[in-house]
Amino acid sequence: MSKKKIATEAAVIESYTVFYSGDAEKISPHSKGLLTYELGKEDETGSLALRLTANGEGGLFSREWITLDAIHAILERQQDSFPSRVFRSLFGQGSTNNAGFLAAVLRSPDICLIEADSSRLFMHHCYADWQHRMTQLAALSQD
């Protein structure tokens, strides 16, 4: 009986309305296919989140929703160049690909919060105006 209750609570927690869907190129030049992601608004609280929904080449990844507030908190702590692994703590489960895939989405032209470090492909740094860009993403949910 408690299993049903847990399943019901999980369904409520995962209740998001998707307001944007997009594609992102993977970071590695050797990887093929695109990553597909969604931006959503949690129905009860109104919090905004992002999740991966497809990997064009197949392979493991997590479909869990990651709040924009949690992403903001991670980015706020980055002073210099940083690796994708800083995003690992955002995922409760799944593949080691998750952090790198999230970084790829955050680099994508439609999200555009971080960019490649000029000297190291797999390192990132935040755009100077990333917080303003985050506000613009939130505004998409109002349209």
Model-based region annotation:
Residues 61-65, 77, 81, 96-100:
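Generic alpha-helical scaffold signal
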Residues 56-73, 108:
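A structural signal for long, well-ordered, hydrophobic/aromatic- and basic-residue-enriched core segments
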Residues 66-71, 76-91:
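Short acidic, hydrophobic short linear motifs in intrinsically disordered regions
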